[in-house]
Design a protein with these regions (language model features):
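Small-residue-rich helix-loop
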Residues: 325-429
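N-terminal Rossmann-like or analogous alpha/beta NTP/dinucleotide-binding catalytic cores
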Residues: 1-121, 212-226
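Conserved phosphate-binding loops in nucleotide/dinucleotide-binding enzymes
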Residues: 81-85, 180-181, 199-211, 238-271, ...
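Structural motif
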Residues: 16-18, 258-266, 302-308, 342-351, ...
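Residue-level signal for inorganic ion chemistry
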Residues: 27, 58, 98, 102, ...
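Glycine-rich phosphate/pyrophosphate-binding loops
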Residues: 32-44, 190-203, 224-238, 451-454, ...
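Active-site cores that bind ATP or allylic diphosphates and position pyrophosphate for catalysis
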Residues: 97, 105-233, 239-246, 254, ...
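Charged substrate- and nucleic-acid-binding regions of tRNA-handling and nucleotidyl-transfer enzymes
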Residues: 413-476
Length: 479
């Protein structure tokens, strides 16, 4: 049985966006599942769009996501080089084969002449086809002119796509196209076919936008006498409204931005796997190992998948909750509030253990934890905005805080003892938990939410808790 080999072949033209990552994830999952090879190839032949540093950004993004490659930049392999600009000699060999077999010719026309052909076709209200202007006696190709593919046969192609099923396209999609540009570099249409064949790629998995070009690819495969690989086109990632492809105007961001915003790599991969694939069950949260085990191309949907950032945040929260506390501690090093800098690691881990379940992203950490490191300034508008507390007059709230202060002064400061003291306060004040606990929580944190009150007070400690209660009492409105 032939070993499965897949690839991801990005162009270094800028940041990696969501669609790029999914185009890397699906072939990576398939290769990992089948114990095959996953090749990273940098398609850098379009020098006009080349962005300095983009290759390094691609590599670092894949590193962060945990998408490792069997062959490619940094790791090498038997099928290198893995940058197309370093493979010119390979394209020259295959180009010469096409010339020798009568399937390629040097393009003798100037841009002005080509434009004249286009203008004439437009005036005659017909489609412009380059094959209608093939030179009868083209010059010998010396590498300074563009080299064009001479489509051998104008026919309808039918092929099977592992996701989309049987597809067909007619002669209207076929025309003579450039194989090698005048700068000596190949076009994508030519280079990727040569590279995939020489690198032993068995499954070509890419975006749906490539379907329209399939007839020209298939024609070139046949002219090169190369067996077709398995093709799989992934459905579009749609904007939230489901009406168009996701774009920058719809809030599409680079993966690096999501990383900065505190999204976990495993959550991002889980989310992107669900953009067009499911395992047929109700399961939504997957580990990387589960994705590798369950992934299959026949479970990839044909229709577009909506990009729902709220779902990404939900998944991220789920993955944060699953992390071991020491692992999470390593990941939040750069997300702590500045006031945490002098705290011990032991104390920060204790704080993290309390707030872990409330984090949707790592950037939520400062808001969820800052009051553990510095006494906040009282904000009594939070009491008036609270559904339970706004029913009580400020004087009543101050009285409750005084009672709580008195009770907690004589309480051992561990969660169980604090809970018992709070229960006693409920009985003595006749208040509901929602009212009593809310005012104490506000007084010590001035935050809309906090972990369980006994745990919060115990971690703050008796001295800090009593001091904050007293500050709240002293600052309480008188009317």
């Amino acid at each position: 049985m032939t070993k499965i080999t897949t690839r991801f072949a990005p162009s270094p033209t800028g940041y990696i966006h969501i669609g790029n990552v999914r185009s890397a994830l699906f072939p990576w999952l398939l290769a990992k599942q089948q114990q095959g090879s996953f090749i990273l190839r940098i398609e850098d032949t379009d020098q006009s769009r080349y962005v300095e540093g983009a290759t390094e950004l691609i590599l670092s993004t894949l590193d962060w996501l945990g998408i490792n490659w069997t062959e490619g930049p940094r790791v090498g392999g038997p099928h290198g080089p893995y940058f197309q600009t370093e493979r010119r000699d390979r394209y020259q060999i295959w180009a010469q084969k096409l010339i020798d077999n009568g399937f390629a010719y040097a393009d003798p026309y100037t841009p002005e002449e080509v434009q004249a052909f286009r203008d004439k076709a437009k005036a005659e209200k017909r489609a412009f086809l380059y094959r209608d202007h093939r030179p009868e006696n083209p010059p010998s190709w010396d590498g300074t002119q563009p080299l064009r593919f001479k489509v051998p046969e104008i026919k309808r192609y039918t092929w099977n796509d592992a996701v989309m099923g049987e597809l067909t396209a007619g002669p209207e999609a076929l025309d003579d196209f450039i194989l090698i540009k005048s700068d000596g570099l190949p076009t994508y249409n030519f280079a990727h076919i040569v590279d995939d064949f020489e690198m032993g790629v068995t499954h070509v998995i890419r975006g749906l936008e490539y379907i329209s070009s399939m007839p020209k690819y298939l024609s070139l495969y046949d002219a090169l006498e190369i067996e077709w690989p398995v093709f799989a086109c992934l459905p579009h990632i749609m904007a939230a409204d489901g009406k168009k492809k996701l774009g920058k105007r719809d809030g599409a961001k680079s993966v690096e931005e999501y990383r900065t915003e505190g999204i976990l790599p495993e959550a991002m991969l889980n989310f992107l796997a669900s953009m067009g694939w499911n395992d047929g069950t109700e399961q939504e949260v997957f580990t990387i190992d589960e994705l590798i085990e369950k992934f299959s191309l026949d479970r990839v949907q044909r229709s577009g998948a909506r990009f729902d950032e709220q779902r990404l945040l939900w998944l991220n929260g789920q993955h944060i909750r699953r992390l071991e506390i020491n692992d999470l501690s390593q990941r939040v090093v750069n997300f702590w509030p500045a006031t945490a800098s002098s705290a011990s690691e032991e104390y920060k881990i204790a704080v993290l253990s309390l707030v872990q379940d409330r984090l949707k992203t790592l950037t939520d950490l400062p808001l969820s934890s800052s009051y553990f490191f510095e006494a906040p300034t009282p904000d009594w508008t939070m009491a008036t905005d609270n559904k339970q507390l706004k029913k009580l007059a400020p004087a009543e709230l101050a009285t409750l805080l005084k009672t709580a202060h008195t009770t907690l002064e004589t309480t051992d400061f561990n969660p169980d003892a604090i809970q018992a003291a709070l229960n006693t306060l409920l009985e003595s004040t006749g208040q509901k938990p929602g009212t009593l606990f809310s005012i104490i929580r506000l007084a010590v944190s001035w935050a809309p939410f906090s972990p369980a009150l006994p745990d919060t007070l115990a971690l703050l400690g008796k001295e800090q808790t009593l001091a904050r209660l007293q500050t709240a009492i002293d600052s309480a409105p008188t009317a």
